[in-house]
């Protein structure tokens, strides 16, 4: 029951979010934590104790990219302009977000996995749930997932498509409407999905992001 409630709350919260700097990742994971029942909280707490909260734990995957360079490619899947579909078979040898998501889920579910590996797996899963719903994380290698697609946003400031989706949209919405507006917009849609396992939908989420990337970039 812990797994079903945890994965449902995490994945459904991330489905309606669209920007993933620290604010987005932390908001989704903290709100997912609030939906857990007492037994699920008891199971999760030891795995996030090092960070003090699940929201903070979900930022860890970005913090370690400089030190653990092999994990950088785990955050996205880039396909050429001619390729419309995303699936795990297209991942390069060094991995992509779809394959890495499944790998970390399997580690987390494996009863024989060491505690330290379960910790990291949970932190990765929490982070990837956000990244996989960011369209530029399913973009094109030619423009580095939107990093070379330049534009202007808010008072004519220079930016790029990846930064826009990754955090500037949510920062702008939070400034204009407030954080409570963002949370209410997402959490109001969740209850009907609780109790359903959504962990098998990873590839469809990546495909949705790919479809948006192809329309918007």
Features from the language model and the residues they span:
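N-terminal signal peptide c-region/cleavage motif recognized by signal peptidases
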Residues: 14-16
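Extended hydrophobic/aromatic-rich secondary-structure runs
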Residues: 1-2, 103
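N-terminal, motif-rich segments that launch catalysis or mediate targeting to/interaction with membranes
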Residues: 18-128, 135-217
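Sec-dependent signal peptide recognition
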Residues: 2-8
């Amino acid at each position: 029951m812990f797994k079903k409630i945890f994965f449902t709350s995490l994945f459904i919260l991330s489905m309606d979010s669209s920007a993933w700097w620290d604010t987005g990742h932390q908001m989704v994971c903290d709100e997912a934590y609030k939906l857990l029942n007492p037994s699920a909280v008891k199971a999760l707490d030891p795995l996030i104790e090092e960070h003090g909260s699940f929201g903070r734990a979900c930022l860890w995957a970005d913090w370690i990219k400089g030190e653990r360079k092999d994990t950088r490619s785990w955050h996205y899947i880039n396909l050429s302009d001619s390729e419309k579909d995303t699936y795990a078979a297209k991942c390069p040898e060094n991995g992509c977000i779809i394959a890495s998501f499944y790998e970390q889920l399997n580690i987390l579910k494996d009863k024989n996995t060491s505690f330290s590996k379960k910790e990291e797996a949970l932190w990765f899963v929490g982070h990837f749930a956000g990244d996989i719903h960011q369209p530029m994380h399913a973009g094109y290698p030619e423009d580095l997932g939107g990093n070379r697609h330049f534009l202007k946003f808010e008072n004519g400031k220079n930016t790029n498509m990846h930064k826009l989706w990754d955090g500037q949209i949510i920062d702008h919405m939070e400034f204009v409407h407030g954080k409570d507006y963002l949370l209410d917009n997402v959490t109001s849609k969740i209850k009907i999905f609780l109790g359903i396992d959504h962990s098998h939908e990873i590839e469809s989420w990546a495909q949705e992001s790919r479809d948006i990337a192809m329309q918007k970039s």
